[in-house]
From Swiss-Prot:
Pfam families: TetR_C_6, TetR_N
Record's keyword terms, sorted: DNA-binding, Repressor, Transcription, Transcription regulation
The protein's annotated pathway: Amine and polyamine biosynthesis; betaine biosynthesis via choline pathway [regulation]
UniProt-recorded Gene Ontology molecular function terms: DNA-binding transcription factor activity; transcription cis-regulatory region binding
Signal peptide: none
Gene: betI
Entry-linked InterPro entries: BetI_C, DNA-bd_HTH_TetR-type_CS, Homeodomain-like_sf, HTH-type_TetR-like_transc_reg, HTH_TetR, Tet_transcr_reg_TetR-rel_C_sf, Tscrpt_rep_BetI
GO biological process: glycine betaine biosynthetic process from choline; negative regulation of DNA-templated transcription
Name this protein carries in UniProt: HTH-type transcriptional regulator BetI
Amino acid sequence: MPKVGMQPIRRSQLIAATLEAVDQVGMADASIAYIARLAGVSNGIISHYFNDKNGLLEATMRHLMQALSAAVGKRRRALDEDSPRAHLRAMIDGNFDDSQVSGPAMKTWLAFWASSMHQPALRRLQRVNDHRLYSNLCGQFRRVLPQDQARFAARGLASLIDGLWLRGALSGEAFDTEQARRIAYDYLDLQLNKAR
């Protein structure tokens, strides 16, 4: 008989082991057996909670997306002002939060993006993530720019955030979050200056 309350603990343990496995050996070599060994559980436990490796990857991505949403939300709730610039900066900062730029998170995001081109469930998650960023950016730009300019600025900033993140992930060095923020802030200010 399973212990009451173990499911959330076990799921978190397996997601953490997945992040560690992808960091150590990459997604292709992060087998169910390897992940189970890192988590200190049997292979059957993964099948019980996630059905298969794809289910575990999907749960891991949901975990990273929730961490991203929490990082952005925390920064936005802490704002002293309600200006579009302040909200947009908080979104930039949240996307470069430690939870998103650690080695395990970055490698897992990269594996997720590659897998999302072939797996419908992951493709849906990617579309949700992309739309959420674009929609939130566009909503703030729309407060000060005409609709077409707001959409253009939001698409540009979303692309810049993703591009800076991707370059940082592939650099092989520690992610320079301060430099990434400065570049994104510069683009943000260029777009907001169009409102004058």
